[in-house]
A protein has these predicted regions:
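Conserved RNA-binding domains used in RNP assembly and mRNA/RNA metabolism
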Residues: 2-80
Length: 80
């Protein structure tokens, strides 16, 4: 089976600074923008799953499971 290589741009939860902050300071923090690359092995309305590796026996290694709400964009990477 053929799998698409994809770049996923997504937002992650972050804790930018340890320690106490005022409510005003806390409201200024934002989710961390991230990018991940992998083989698209599954997607549905709730989630997208990519794998770092796929073996000849179609076993996977290095999975990342993304909730759809965290994903900003998915781009197919063309390769030869």
């Amino acid at each position: 089976m053929e799998y698409n290589l994809v770049l996923i741009e997504w937002k992650d939860i972050c804790d930018p600074h340890a320690g106490w902050k005022s409510l005003e300071e806390s409201a200024e923090f934002n989710p961390m923008p991230c990018k991940s690359v992998g083989w698209l092995i599954f997607e549905n309305p709730e989630k997208v799953i990519i794998a770092q590796d796929i073996s000849g026996d179609e076993e996977t290694n290095g999975l990342s499971v993304f909730p759809r709400g965290c994903i900003k964009d998915i781009k197919r990477i063309k390769y030869e």
